[in-house]
Structure formats: C-alpha cells, structure tokens
C-alpha cells in the first residue's frame, strides 16, 4: 500500500540552533584566554568547585576556574580515557568520579582539549556539590603546593535554621580572610554588594530561561540547558 506521508522533512522536526550560542562560545574563549594569561597580567587564579561561592573571588578580581567544567570538556573531546588511565597508574581507583580522575591525570600530563588549566594560586572547595571534591582538591593542593580553603555546608534534612546560617556565615568570613591573606589585598565589601546583585539578577534570569522549556514545543533541549549552564556557573556575578 502506498503511504500518504510526504517524504519532505516536517518543519517541526528541524533542529533550530540557538543564535546566542556563538556569542557564548566567544565569551567563554575570552574567559579562558584571560585565565591562561593571568600571571602575565598579575592576576590570581583560583580553582573552585561548581557549587562554591564565586562572588568573593569576582569581588577581589581573582579569576575562577572550574575543574568540573574541564572534566566535562575532556569527556566531550573523547580524551578522558587516557587521563583517567594516568590517574589510575598513580594509584587512584577506577571507581572514582571520571571528572576527578581526568583532572588529576591532566594536571600531571599538562594536555587536554585546551592544553590543561592555568595553574592555581589557591583552591576553594565547597562540599555542597558532592563528597568527592574534598579529596580531589586536597590532591591538587598538594600537587600544585597551594593553599586550600574548604567551605562545609550542612545538609538541610529538616529545613534551614538560624544555627546553619550562623555556621555558614562564620565560614564565609573565614573565606574572606583567607582570600586577603593569599592575595595580600583588603577585601572590598562595596564591590561584593555589586557582584552579589549581578549574581542574584543572573540567577533569576536563568530561572526564567529554564521556565520557557515548559512550552510545547520547548524552545531548547536539556542539552542546550547544560551547554548554557556554563555562564551561570563560570561567570556568575559579572556582566
């Protein structure tokens, strides 16, 4: 029997590229270029976990770098197997997170899709993202011989309490003192207010972007959302 279906592709099946993707790639390229040339420009580089408070770094003009993002880039470039094998040769179990193994191996080999990350002047680890990051960052702090700050965030099993707020506030003050000590500069609280406002505005706008996916058909996919997530993680608090 003959089919009544047309051989022409359905317009609704066409993949429409998001125009802002190119601009994002350009901005991210500039971000990595600035990080790679930080030492020449007398700037400090901090490796920070994706859930860590980046705003104090931005306020102090410290360039934040995200090894987790780098792990994703290594995986997307099909280079993870070699770096993971290097980490395993160093004694790290193949059961560990592949992002961690990729980053540990890459730091030794100094390769990868962008030629390795710029060496850190400090490491900032916040355990609200996962438990692996604490040991991962301890390993890298020893390898690069740089100071490490760990921010411990309690798990809110029964809700947010004043005790939790005070506990985290105390650590944030310690975090600021740590940054002052490493950089030798006084912290600019007025600048932090500006950065905080931009960060909050960015988070609200990102929520609006995500909310449009409730529309049918959705204007962007889950893969698009992961791709554009780089902005709200990496450049939060900037404009």
Locate the predicted segments by residue:
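A charged, amphipathic alpha-helical module
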Residues: 5-44, 169, 173-239
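Short, Asp-centered acidic motifs that coordinate Mg2+ and/or phosphate
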Residues: 44-45, 122
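Short alpha-helix boundary/capping motifs
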Residues: 46-47, 130
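An N-terminal, globular interaction/scaffold subdomain
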Residues: 47-116, 136-137
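Short, hydrophobic/amphipathic alpha-helical patches that form generic packing surfaces
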Residues: 54-59, 139, 226-235
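Internal, well-ordered alpha/beta segment that forms a basic, Gly-enriched binding/recognition surface
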Residues: 106-108, 114-208, 212
């Amino acid at each position: 029997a003959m089919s009544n279906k047309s051989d022409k592709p359905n317009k609704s099946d066409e993949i429409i590229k998001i125009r802002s993707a190119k601009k994002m790639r350009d901005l991210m390229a500039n971000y990595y270029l600035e990080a790679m040339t930080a030492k020449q420009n007398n700037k400090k580089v901090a490796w920070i976990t994706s859930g860590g408070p980046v705003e104090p770094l931005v306020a102090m003009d410290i360039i934040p770098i995200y090894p987790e993002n780098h792990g994703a880039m290594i995986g997307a470039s099909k280079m993870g197997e070699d770096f993971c094998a290097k980490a395993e040769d160093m004694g790290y179990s193949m059961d560990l997170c592949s992002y961690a193994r990729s980053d540990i191996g890459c730091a030794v080999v100094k390769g990868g899709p962008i030629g390795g990350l710029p060496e850190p002047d400090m490491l900032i680890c916040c355990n609200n993202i996962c438990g692996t990051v604490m040991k991962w960052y301890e390993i890298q702090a020893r390898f690069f011989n740089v100071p490490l700050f760990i921010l411990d965030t309690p798990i809110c099993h029964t809700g947010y309490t004043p005790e939790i707020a005070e506990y985290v506030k105390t650590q944030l003050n310690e975090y600021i003192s740590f940054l002052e000590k490493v950089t030798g500069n006084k912290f600019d609280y007025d600048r932090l207010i500006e950065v905080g406002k931009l960060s909050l505005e960015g988070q609200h706008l990102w929520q609006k972007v995500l909310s449009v996916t409730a529309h049918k058909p959705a204007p962007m996919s889950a893969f698009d959302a992961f791709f554009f997530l780089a902005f709200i993680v990496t450049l939060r608090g900037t404009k």
